[in-house]
């Protein structure tokens, strides 16, 4: 260490080069101010008005709609990002910028793109799992970028943890010798991501990677009045981080300003010997006049600076000027490897400023922004297309093996290149879903709230998907012209499936059906109407979560449960919750005489996913999905068929192994996406034709696995997976994911080209789909109604 505790002032001559450059830049910018500063950035259109200093016309405003908070940036009352408004006045002034903006509009764009650019350089250890961010609230784009990146590039992203310490306003608790931390007023990130905000430093854990971004906003382009305060704060954050960093593999990404080399020499000196690798990184996308730079410190040695120096610094924070408290021996700073690398980066920054001032080149910013997106693997708004294929999808799964039920490791999947490609498709799908995180949506709405959707000021995701629902006009006519009951999208989808696969219900005068996860009853109604059109009777039974026990059970919206209480089965006397993730419930159904000789079964399992769990829908549904499958195998008669709903991306080992099993014990297994199913959602229907049966011992093993908490979405429960099945499976699921991505792209396209959406409505495109649906699906007027 070159720091000694003395009272001498430090020689500031080392900053002369920086000060001289700043003086020249100030003189240049005095001719045009803000506009001249912004025009210097080739990537300005990436994040319009991304100011690193305070400006009276720049503001962040929170808007709340549908119980959702939106963080919206404005300059001079012009909406900057995210673009969420119908209001043409807001959009007109930046309309030319919109196509070149990123498709994903971050909550915190201020730092999102800088860190994204850093992450694309692949410095971060790919095995890092636990991350800590320490910094200002407006710099949370750093951790936002990290979460998106890990979802896109790491297969085990669900195991990652993200912790946030909002800097500023920490208060010391003398009783616990810790610091109390403030939470953000509006927790935007927690709406969409699983992230933990600390309230006390006692909650700190051990982390693989720590990001520190605690530099204050400047007062002007080069006016850093809080330099001394920022140095004190960053010393504290740095020392605290070293105590909570994993030894040997731990890393820190630390942002500071080159405005004052002097302040950061103390940090260079303290860090010398603490890490094996040092690298400076200055993102291309930031403004040339912005002095920020990142220092990446990798492979923590475990060495922490001497306690006497550390204690002297910490006990004098904010009390004395650091340069007065310590003497920095500048005669030896030249041998510090961090300082040597810093000089290279600092001189490059200075040279770039001088070159720009001297040349003032004309730049095609749009071209640079597009190149930046291409290089850093981010999509732009202009990359979306208005793909309008609403045709149904039907794929038959091949399997010539007979796997046995056995729990094995799923690691063999991770070594398969085809499976790796499928995981990449899952990552792409999740990214497209993420695009709507910062846009208003009714998924945040508490349904008990009264809300007038007709007067919404913002473009909502629901408005786009609702307008692109080409089958919505079918519902009214099914009710009015055909006396249809409980007409919902679910009704239309099952009716379409029954017509597409007429052989899944046997041709007999009376058919007995059993409907799983059925409330409020649309599948019963659709099957009843379909059977009536064939001149047959339906003897139906249904199950769902018992509303007496489960507040999450669906309401008896249409009154079918109260009208037919004997038709709704919830289990046994000992357990009548209706929870099909319990083998006890399924066994009670299998032994129930009312359910003997079942001809047809449906499963419509689903679960409410919180907005921050939408990319984990398949994982959350894993055991419920298994429950409805086991129930079908336990209750369905041999030779009969079933249909159940599941969700893409179908990459979880448990789902793959279950479908592997099903394809071997049914004559046919078909993936089907009805035309009436919203193309942008993840639901897929599995059609199971002609059940071959399963042995009692195999069924008992499935019961045990269903009840075993160790069997999760990552479990693989068959002993073999043949090439024929796997090749067929990968191809089918890949095609379905591609279709969903195309539909999501279409929705995003119309989000930004809403005028074309109005044109679709004017052109009455709905009539084409209306005619096609009724031509394909025979419907008759229902006289024998369920509610007679």
Swiss-Prot record:
UniProtKB keywords: Methyltransferase, S-adenosyl-L-methionine, Transferase
Residue span(s) of domain Adrift-type SAM-dependent 2'-O-MTase: 485-693
EC class name: transferase
Positions annotated as active site in the UniProt record: 645 (proton acceptor)
Keyword Oxidoreductase: no
One GO MF term: mRNA (nucleoside-2'-O-)-methyltransferase activity
Positions bound to S-adenosyl-L-methionine: 521, 604
Enzyme Commission number, as recorded: 2.1.1.-
Highest taxon, organism lineage: Viruses
Single Gene Ontology BP annotation: methylation
Keyword DNA-binding: no
InterPro entries registered for this protein in UniProt: Adrift-typ_MeTrfase, mRNA_Cap_2O-Ribose_MeTrfase, RNA_MeTrfase_FtsJ_dom
Protein name (record): Uncharacterized protein L511
Protein species of origin: Acanthamoeba polyphaga mimivirus (APMV)
């Amino acid at each position: 260490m070159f720091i000694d505790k003395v009272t001498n002032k430090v020689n500031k001559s080392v900053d002369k080069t920086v000060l001289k450059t700043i003086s020249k830049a100030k003189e240049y910018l005095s001719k045009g101010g803000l506009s001249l500063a912004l025009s210097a950035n080739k990537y300005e259109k990436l994040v319009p008005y991304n100011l690193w200093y305070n400006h009276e016309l720049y503001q962040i405003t929170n808007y709340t709609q549908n119980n959702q908070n939106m963080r919206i940036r404005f300059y001079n009352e012009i909406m900057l990002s995210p673009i969420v408004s119908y209001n043409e006045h807001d959009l007109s002034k930046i309309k030319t910028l919109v196509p070149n903006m990123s498709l994903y509009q971050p909550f915190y764009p201020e730092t999102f793109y800088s860190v994204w650019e850093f992450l694309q350089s692949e410095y971060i250890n790919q095995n890092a799992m636990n991350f800590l961010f320490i910094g200002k609230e407006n710099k949370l784009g750093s951790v936002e970028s990290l979460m998106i990146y890990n979802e896109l590039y790491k297969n085990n992203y669900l195991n990652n943890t993200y912790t946030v310490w909002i800097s500023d306003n920490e208060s010391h608790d003398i009783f616990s010798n810790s610091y109390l931390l403030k939470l953000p007023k509006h927790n935007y990130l927690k709406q969409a991501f699983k992230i933990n905000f600390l309230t006390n430093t006692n909650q700190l854990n051990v982390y693989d990677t720590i990001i520190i971004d605690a530099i204050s906003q400047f007062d002007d382009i080069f006016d850093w009045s809080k330099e001394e305060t920022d140095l004190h704060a960053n010393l504290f954050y740095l020392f605290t981080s070293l105590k909570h960093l994993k030894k040997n593999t731990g890393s820190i990404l630390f942002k500071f300003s080159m405005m004052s080399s002097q302040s950061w020499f103390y940090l260079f000196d303290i860090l010398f010997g603490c890490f094996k690798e040092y690298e400076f990184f200055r993102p291309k996308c930031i403004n040339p006049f912005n002095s920020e730079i990142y220092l990446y410190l990798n492979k923590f040695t475990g060495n922490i600076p001497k306690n006497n120096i550390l204690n002297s610094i910490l006990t004098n924070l904010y009390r004395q000027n650091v340069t007065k408290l310590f003497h920095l021996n500048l005669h030896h700073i030249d041998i510090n490897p961090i300082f040597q690398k810093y000089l290279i980066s600092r001189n490059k920054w200075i040279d770039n400023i001088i070159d720009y001032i001297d040349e003032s080149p004309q730049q095609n910013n749009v071209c640079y922004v597009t190149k930046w997106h291409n290089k850093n693997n981010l999509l732009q708004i202009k990359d979306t297309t208005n793909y309008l294929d609403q045709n149904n999808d039907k794929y038959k799964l091949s399997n010539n093996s007979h796997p046995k039920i056995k729990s094995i490791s799923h690691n063999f999947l991770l070594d398969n290149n085809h499976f790796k490609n499928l995981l990449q498709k899952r990552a792409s799908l999740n990214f497209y879903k993420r695009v709507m995180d910062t846009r208003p949506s009714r998924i945040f709405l508490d349904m008990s709230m009264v809300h007038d959707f007709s007067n919404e000021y913002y473009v909502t995701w629901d408005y786009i998907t609702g307008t692109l629902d080409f089958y919505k006009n079918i519902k009214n006519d099914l009710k009015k012209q055909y006396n249809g009951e409980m007409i919902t999208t679910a009704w239309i989808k099952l009716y379409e499936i029954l017509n597409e696969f007429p052989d899944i219900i046997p041709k007999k005068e009376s058919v007995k059906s059993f409907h799983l996860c059925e409330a409020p009853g649309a599948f019963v109604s659709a099957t009843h109407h379909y059977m009536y059109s064939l001149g047959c009777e339906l003897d139906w039974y249904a199950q769902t979560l018992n509303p007496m026990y489960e507040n999450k059970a669906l309401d008896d919206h249409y009154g079918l449960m109260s009208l037919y209480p004997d038709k709704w089965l919830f289990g046994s006397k000992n357990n009548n919750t209706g929870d099909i993730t319990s083998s006890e419930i399924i066994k009670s159904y299998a032994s129930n005489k009312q359910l003997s000789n079942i001809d047809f079964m449906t499963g419509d399992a689903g679960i409410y996913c919180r907005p921050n769990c939408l990319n984990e829908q398949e994982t959350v549904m894993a055991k419920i999905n298994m429950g409805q499958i086991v129930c079908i195998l336990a209750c369905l008669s041999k030779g009969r068929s079933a249909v159940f709903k599941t969700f893409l991306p179908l990459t979880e080992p448990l789902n793959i192994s279950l479908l592997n099993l099903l394809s071997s014990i049914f004559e046919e297994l078909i993936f089907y996406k009805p035309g009436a199913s919203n193309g942008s959602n993840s639901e897929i229907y599995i059609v199971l034709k002609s059940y071959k049966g399963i042995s009692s011992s195999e069924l008992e093993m499935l019961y045990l696995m269903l009840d075993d908490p160790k069997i999760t979405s990552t479990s693989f429960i068959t002993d073999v997976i043949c090439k024929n099945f796997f090749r067929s499976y990968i191809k089918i699921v890949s095609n379905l994911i591609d279709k969903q991505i195309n539909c999501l792209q279409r929705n995003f396209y119309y989000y930004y080209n809403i005028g074309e959406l109005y044109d679709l409505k004017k052109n009455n495109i709905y009539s084409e789909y209306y005619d096609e649906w009724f031509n394909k699906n025979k419907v008759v007027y229902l006289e024998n109604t369920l509610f007679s």
